[in-house]
Amino acid sequence: MKNIYKAFVALAVTAGSLTTTSCIEETEPTSAASEEQVMQSEKSMASLLWGIPASLNLEDADGGHYRFGYGAIMHIRDIQTGDLLRYMYGQYNHFSNWAANKYQGRDYAYGQYIWNFSYKFVQTTNTLIRAINVETATDTEKGYLGAAYAFRAMAYLDLAREYEFLPNKVFPDGKNEDGNVVTGLTVPIVDENTTEQTAANNPRATREKMAEFILSDLNKAEELITNLTFSSKTLPHLDCVYGLKARYYMWLAGEDKQYYAQAAEYAQKAFKAAGISPMTSEDCLSKSKGFNDISKWMWGMQLVKENGAVQTGIVNWVSWMSNETTYGYAAAGPYVVMDANLYRQIPWDDFRKNEWTPTTFTTQDADVLAWFQKYACDLNNIYSRNNPDGILYQNMPVYTSFKFRPAQGNTVNSSIAGASAIPLMRVEEMYFIYAEALAHVNPAQGKAVLQSFMKKYRNANYTTDATTEEEVVNEIILQKRIELWGEGQTFFDIKRLNMSVTRGYSDPVKTNWLEQYRFNTDGRPSWMNWVIVQTEGNTNAAVNDYNNPDPSDTYKEWSED
């Protein structure tokens, strides 16, 4: 933690010198600031503000080509579920070890990247929060401050849900290797007031303390963010704060059902305040704009061709998530694919089924060829790792994703294709949170909300026989898993609801997971309690004996035999 603190102390000092009060004291002995000074201060604060969303897309190609920013962490969460797989072990698949549950302990570089990236992002928010005195700030600066609080709340809500130890069948008593019970412990809190001395002995916050801290940030964001005049969806606005509160209360409700009412309240506020409708079939299946258009979402990340990640060509979201590019990692073999059993549960009259290939490509079957002609970006692409003279689509396994299109549908020019958008929050998620939160209290009411959403926006013929709380909640989560596939959210639902991950099966369909990834868990997987890296313990003694137990290699591979 001291290392993280030192890395940003210079920036913090610089930012601190830019506060309105500081400017007044240096150049204006009286109590009034000139208009020019105020404008200069606001300009400086704006630079700090825009640095926050920009930092989400920072890549670290020298450390490994899986290090392409927040999108990579979203993808790691999905890799740890049973819904999304990469069709390769090792070689070009840099995410193999998360899927294979290997090297997840404190001494490995894989966890190091997540930890370092997350806390560096936290520090970008702390820098702006430290720089603005709300008592003397202009309305414009208050808007910036509200956005910073929202970003920080997002970061800590993620960290809390990733690192909080929850009991599982592998470690049912919550004890780690040192014999200490770590159930309910999250991560150390580093805020704008944390000193180097404090960081050296900063224990993991309890669930209760972390919840209090996050809610404080969210309440401040809710109060201040209406002053934000920038309309860019790379910044959070009031609808996003409501959305974060909905996620927050769902997290708390995992241990205390009384919070479901508040989750439902804020989810409804979020989709009403968003002022946008769920994506249509045309939006979702567009060859040029499918899931790369930030205007369709509440909140997202936006890359431009000047971004370092885009300029690398291959260390970015599109390289890893768009199977149709001729230059990226995905098309080189580690295709990103949907779980066979999940795909089976999508009916053909649900247009979302067409976000994944129904079969392997062939020109010999007219129906198959017609499907690819309708939904593929460019059947004329002549590239594949295994067959340089063949059509790219010939090597794709069944259930390959077409969901995340390269920007402008361009599959060959990395500087164009990589300038894409990545979803952080969609209005669809809020509808599913609303339905689930209601279902835990009144299953019939939650079911009615689900049916209304599905019939209106996804499948006019949708129906479900679910009636009990468990049945209705499971059906809502199923539809949410399909809807938000690849967007990094399913991990949190599986963990909080103590749901199993099933990758090995032969009925009613045969598994499409590689042997190295075929684990079946009984309840939440042990690997969803992420381990704090040793470098943190080296500088923050308080976490050393209170880390999560290492989940690596704690499950036996499923076999049909």
Could you describe each region identified by the protein language model?
Residues 19-75, 319-321, 331-336, 342-362, ...:
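Membrane-proximal, proline-rich intrinsically disordered regions
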Residues 67, 264-427, 483, 498, ...:
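Hydrophobic-face positions in mid-chain alpha helices that act as interaction patches
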Residues 90-165, 205-209, 220-229, 415-422, ...:
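Conserved, well-structured interaction surfaces
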Residues 1-31:
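Bacterial Sec-dependent N-terminal signal peptides
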